């Protein structure tokens, strides 16, 4: 007879599919939040946590055990099914279930889910109506049993009491956001005003520097104009000096060779560049002094040859 394990295979497939769904949900959430992630790292972390929860809670073994029992019943082995039925009705099993329920109650209490909330959740359920904002409140079998046992009372003072629920003070939140916006606006304005003030100071410094540069340029232009005037005056004086010396030279009783030599030196004077002209005049004066010195020495020698003595008074 062929052994059937289709139920166990289906349960294993559902568990594996649940794990894949958990990985897809985790990666999709990270993508929507704009968080970069490593797929292999997410896969490893989710698998480790998923395997731990499924094994530690006993859910995986419970599902596989029940699937194995169903497969055994399908294969004609009812012994395990009978044992499971007896186990479910055993007093120890009931005590264990009570213990688990009490443990779950304490866990819920530690999480902030008090007795009132647990009882209300057990007695009522809410059914949403598609296309409408209203809902239908349904009573559970526990609520029906409590009504039959007379455990439901009507509290008239409840109408005047305010339900203790968590509400959002939108006005306070709006005021808080408005304060934050005003603070941010003030900081932006301060930064903008500071930037404008610095820009004004830079512009003022630039304009002041431009004025100083303009004044200096005007002064330089004035000095250049004055220097040009001085240079023109010097050129005029030098030309006048050369002309005067030439005229004076022609009126003197000197030999033509001497006059020609002096005129050549006068014509060689640079009348355009005053600095060169001064150097030329210096050279001319030195030559004249040197010629005078030679002439005096010649005269002194001639006097001595005539048996005369030269004296200076």
Swiss-Prot record:
Gene Ontology CC, one term: host cell cytoplasm
InterPro entries with a match to the protein in the record: NSP3_N_rotavirus, NSP3_sf, Rotavirus_NSP3
Region (Dimerization) location: 150-206
GO molecular function terms attached to this record: RNA binding
GO biological process: regulation of translation
Keywords: Coiled coil, Host cytoplasm, Host-virus interaction, RNA-binding, Translation regulation
Coiled coil: 166-237
Pfam families named among the record's database cross-references: Rota_NSP3 (PF01665)
Region (Interaction with host ZC3H7B): 170-234
Record region (Interaction with host EIF4G1): 208-313
Subcellular location: Host cytoplasm
Region entry RNA-binding, spans: 1-149
Membership in a protein family: Belongs to the rotavirus NSP3 family.
Function: Plays an important role in stimulating the translation of viral mRNAs. These mRNAs are capped but not polyadenylated, instead terminating in a conserved sequence 'GACC' at the 3' that is recognized by NSP3, which competes with host PABPC1 for EIF4G1 binding. The interaction between NSP3 and host EIF4G1 stabilizes the EIF4E-EIF4G1 interaction, thereby facilitating the initiation of capped mRNA translation.
Assembly notes: Homodimer. Interacts (via the coiled-coil region) with host ZC3H7B (via LD motif). Interacts with host EIF4G1.
Official protein name in the record: Non-structural protein 3
Species lineage: Viruses, Riboviria, Orthornavirae, Duplornaviricota, Resentoviricetes
């Amino acid at each position: 007879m062929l052994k059937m394990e289709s139920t166990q295979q289906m349960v294993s497939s559902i568990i594996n599919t649940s794990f894949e769904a958990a990985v897809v949900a985790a990666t999709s959430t990270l993508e929507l939040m704009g968080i970069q992630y490593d797929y292999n790292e997410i896969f490893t972390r989710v698998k480790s946590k998923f395997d731990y929860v499924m094994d530690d809670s006993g859910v995986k073994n419970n599902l596989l055990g029940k699937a194995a029992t169903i497969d055994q019943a399908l294969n004609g082995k009812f012994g395990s099914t009978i044992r499971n039925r007896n186990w479910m009705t055993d007093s120890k099993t009931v005590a264990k279930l009570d213990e688990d329920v009490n443990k779950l109650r304490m866990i819920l209490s530690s999480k902030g889910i008090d007795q009132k909330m647990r009882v209300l959740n057990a007695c009522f359920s809410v059914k949403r109506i598609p296309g409408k904002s209203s809902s239908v409140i349904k009573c559970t079998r526990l609520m029906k049993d409590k009504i039959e046992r007379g455990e439901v009372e009507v509290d008239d003072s409840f109408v005047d009491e305010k339900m203790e629920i968590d509400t959002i003070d939108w006005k306070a939140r709006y005021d808080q956001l408005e304060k934050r916006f005003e603070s941010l606006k003030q900081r932006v304005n301060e930064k903008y005003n500071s930037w404008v003030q610095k820009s004004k100071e830079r512009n003022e410094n630039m304009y002041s520097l431009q004025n100083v540069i303009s004044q200096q340029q005007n002064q330089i232009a004035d000095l250049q104009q004055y220097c040009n005037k001085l240079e023109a005056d010097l050129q005029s004086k030098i030309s006048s000096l050369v002309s005067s010396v030439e005229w004076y030279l022609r009126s003197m009783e000197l030999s033509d060779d001497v006059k020609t030599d002096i005129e050549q030196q006068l014509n060689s004077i640079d009348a355009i560049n005053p600095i060169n002209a001064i150097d030329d005049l210096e050279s001319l004066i030195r030559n004249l002094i040197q010629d005078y010195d030679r002439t005096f020495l010649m005269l002194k020698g001639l006097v001595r040859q005539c048996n005369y003595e030269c004296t200076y008074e």
